[in-house]
């Protein structure tokens, strides 16, 4: 995982007793901004440490920079691992896939790149209330019953109907107006 992961990821690591393998994001020499994670560094980590079970990438990062998720997904799956993308600041990307192309930048939404699990914070770049988010299971690789069990342990038994309603309204608006 990148060292630029959200603090909730670090909390999950502690709860799960998981020791992370860190990959430092590239830094732009001119601006000092963090760039995306280098797919070759991810592959090197997977080759070096056979105990790695999943790879987590934050894309876009806090500066809006996207990693090459398609290439990373290909590498991670070649090594038989799960790819999780924290796309908290990129929930809007699936509505802008038409931007891909001329400049060669990886504009595609992680959900369309073969990623196994994608977390979207819909309140950051879409239209839902603060605190609303979606956990997308995009392939059959993740253990969905186990994920559901863990979520039941951590989530409240009294969900916010305001947040759920805002997610419904958000998806309705985007379905009608999103193109």
Predicted regions and their residues:
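Conserved PLP-enzyme active-site core in the AAT-like
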Residues: 1-179
């Amino acid at each position: 995982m990148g060292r630029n992961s959200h603090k909730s990821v670090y909390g999950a690591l502690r709860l799960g007793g998981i020791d992370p393998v860190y990959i430092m994001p590239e830094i732009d020499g001119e601006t000092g901004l963090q760039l995306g994670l280098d797919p070759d560094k991810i592959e090197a980590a997977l080759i070096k440490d056979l105990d790695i079970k999943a790879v987590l990438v934050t894309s876009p990062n806090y500066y809006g920079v996207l990693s090459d998720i398609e290439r990373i997904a290909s590498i991670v799956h070649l090594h038989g691992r799960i790819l999780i993308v924290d796309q908290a600041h990129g929930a809007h990307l699936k509505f802008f896939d038409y931007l891909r192309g001329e400049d060669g930048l990886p504009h595609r939404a992680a959900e369309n790149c073969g990623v196994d699990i994608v977390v979207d914070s819909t309140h950051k770049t879409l239209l839902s209330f603060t605190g609303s988010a979606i956990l997308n299971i995009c392939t059959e690789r993740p253990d969905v019953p186990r994920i559901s069990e863990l979520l039941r342990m951590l989530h409240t038994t009294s969900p916010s109907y305001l947040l759920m309603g805002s997610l419904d309204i958000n998806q309705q608006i985007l379905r009608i107006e999103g193109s």
